[in-house]
Amino acid sequence: NTSVNMKNGLLYFLLCLAALVSSCDGTNTRYHIGVSQCSDDEWRHKMNKEMQREALFYDGVQVEFRTAKDNNQYQINDINYFIDRKVDLLIVAPNEAAAITPSVEKAIKKGIPVVVVDRKILSDNYTAFVGADNYKIGSDVGHYIVSRLNGKGNIFEVTGLQGSTPAMERHRGLMDALAGIPNIKRVGSVDGGWLQSQAGEKVDSVLRVHKDIDLLFAQNDRMAIGAYLAARQQGREKEMLFVGVDALPGKDYGLEQVISGVLDATFIYPTGGDKVMQIAMNILEKRPFEKENILSTALV
């Protein structure tokens, strides 16, 4: 397995190097695609690699990445940068919907097609959307909780960044799924901001107050792991179950944490970078494409 991974890694490196060399003088670039990522984490890295890899199947495609590091103003600046560069197409993963919507609409008004990925904006004024159904993920988590707790127990929720659409939709799906279950009570929530450290710090404080949590649901695996570590510091990790979302493979990520027993379950949240680039190229090359592209999810 190690040698196969090394060979795959070497092949990917050589392909990237070849693409870089062929386009470094700009003469072979047919399309310049800007990618504005809201954050910089392993889930985003996987998506970026998928986009880069898919772009190699097309001649003369230059993909430029910028990350806003969870900061609305940084992302607004990044989008303005790409607009000023007159990119041929813009891919945007919005940090917070309300803050980033005007920037996406500005790009559209300038004639730049925009593919919105993962998180939505507060408008239909974009060219295409690619992402999972976050309401369904929340609902699926809720149904899993009902089954896992046999219809009775206290749960605590760690949400993602409050202004981001996945956080809002996952919460709404969860609450709708639990609405008809009177013996399952959501005893509280904190905003973990999608970050392991922030979730861990807040859950540490929560556990000093709440002594009766049966299951802790965090809206991504990083926050679920942060919550688990906070509980372990207090010697309470065996008192409750931990459930997350993402199911990334690899050391210290969600899939491994389910196998090792740290997480009780996680739900696949597909990155879909290859699909994003395929749709981007369909738009650029005037081929048919769907405006709304929903990626499937599943329980692990």
Where are these regions (language model features)?
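Bacterial N-terminal signal peptides
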Residues: 12-20
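Extracytoplasmic "Venus flytrap"
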Residues: 32-54, 58, 63-81, 85-87, ...
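Short beta-strand elements at the ligand-binding edges of bilobed clamshell
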Residues: 65-67, 121-144, 157-161, 189, ...
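Hydrophobic alpha-helical segments within soluble ligand-binding/sensing domains
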Residues: 75, 130-155, 198-200, 248-254, ...
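Flexible loop/hinge segments that line or gate small-molecule binding clefts
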Residues: 97-136, 147, 154, 248-259
